[in-house]
């Protein structure tokens, strides 16, 4: 929801890459830091129960965030099977999904997908196209991924809980973009590289349609929420600390 979000990690990895902040609608507030600061990580879950995984310099590490303590705290979870950065995630802390990315330090692209049960990661069926810095939306059983790199792509794939299926492409090819959406039938894709003027596209389960653009261009940002109530924050470019609401 656009009135509740959690931001964690990012570049530079020291000292700011461990910072965690909680969004309540009008304001951000600092809460408990990640145990390991990192950038290019994946995430899933909610403001009360989040999941952080992969990234650099700890490409297999998983941490779980819970608000059962005074300010919220991260604890160690099960490691990813495939070390990677630039991956994306979907789902919850106890039913998560990690996909795509690149293996450091050589930046070998991977299509690997892993499912998390709250304790361990299990390898499941791969993406059709290996890529990193891709867009993401959905749950462990109903996810969508789109765009990515290293060369900007418009490719979109739909996850049904078992397999990834290639579906209709984005209208604008891009990488290092953000996404939001409840499942694989409704999602938003916004901003990214190459400079696109902040284009936003809406997914209806079959096709992408251009809708209102973001107020400022940026890339490597984070997106959360649903197709009708999304939040974009962070990233590189103009006003990179500003949160933007889409309704």
Label for each model-derived stretch:
Residues 1-15, 25, 31-33, 44-58, ...:
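Glycine-centered tight turns/hairpins at beta-strand boundaries that repeat
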Residues 246-247:
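Conserved small/polar residues in nucleotide/adenosyl-binding loops
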Residues 35-41, 80-87, 128-134, 171-177, ...:
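Short glycine-/Asp-/Thr-/Trp-enriched loop segments that recur within the blades
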Residues 72-74:
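A short helix->beta-strand "capping" segment at the edge of beta-propeller domains
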Residues 2, 15-17, 38, 58-59, ...:
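A detector of repeated loop/turn-to-beta-strand junctions in beta-rich toroidal repeat architectures
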């Amino acid at each position: 929801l656009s009135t509740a979000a959690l931001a964690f990690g990012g570049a530079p990895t020291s000292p700011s890459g461990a910072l965690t902040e909680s969004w309540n609608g009008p304001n951000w507030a600092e809460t408990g830091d990640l145990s390991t600061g990192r950038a290019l990580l994946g995430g899933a879950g909610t403001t009360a129960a989040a999941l952080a995984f992969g990234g650099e310099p700890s490409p297999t590490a998983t941490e779980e965030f819970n608000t059962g303590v005074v300010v919220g705290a991260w604890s160690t979870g099960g490691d990813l099977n495939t070390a990677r950065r630039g991956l994306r995630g979907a789902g919850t802390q106890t039913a998560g999904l990690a996909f795509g990315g690149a293996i450091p330090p050589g930046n070998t692209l991977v299509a690997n997908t892993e499912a998390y049960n709250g304790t361990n990661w299990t390898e499941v069926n791969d993406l059709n196209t290996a890529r990193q810095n891709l867009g993401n939306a959905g749950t462990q059983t109903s996810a969508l991924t789109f765009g990515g790199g290293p060369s900007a792509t418009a490719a979109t794939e739909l996850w049904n809980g078992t397999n990834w299926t290639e579906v209709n492409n984005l209208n604008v090819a891009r990488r290092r973009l953000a996404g939001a959406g409840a499942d694989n039938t409704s999602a938003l894709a916004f901003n990214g590289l190459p400079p696109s003027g902040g284009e936003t596209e809406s997914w209806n389960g079959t096709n992408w349609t251009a809708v209102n653009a973001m107020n400022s261009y940026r890339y490597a940002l984070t997106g959360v929420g649903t197709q009708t109530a999304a939040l974009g924050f962070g990233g590189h470019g103009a006003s990179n600390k500003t949160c933007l609401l889409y309704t």
